[in-house]
Amino acid sequence: EFYRSKLFDVSLSRLGSFKLRTLLVLAQKRLKSLDQDCPNDSFHKIRIELKKVRYAYEFLSEIFYFDGLKKYEERLKDMQEIFGALQDYDVWLGILERLPEVAGKEKLESKIYKQIYKTREEILKKRLKFIKATRKISRNLKIYYI
């Protein structure tokens, strides 16, 4: 069936740029909606979106030729690491909540919450520059399939 479809004759650069741009636009929209009131689950969902973007980006970036690709890859990795750190703190908090009451547990929970809020602030601080960089890459990808 694939060989008879319209996609059979589409170049990898055209198909790849469309897919990657779709992922970028979705991530960009979700990042815009983030704020201090969002639950950690919203941040986690964006982390998963960024992971998809990164894998597609790493797989397809060699077929595109325009300025800023390498720099964006570094920014993408940085954002993904920050989102990953937030998820790690959230997991540690969940583990700690399941443990029986022991001396120092509340103090440790307090430290983890502090790290969660610091990490969330860092994400919110960096997201606008990241959205701007994402928009630029997205526009450059668009030329491959229009």
Please give the residue ranges for each predicted region.
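Cationic, histidine-enriched alpha-helical/coil surfaces that engage anionic ligands
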Residues: 1-146
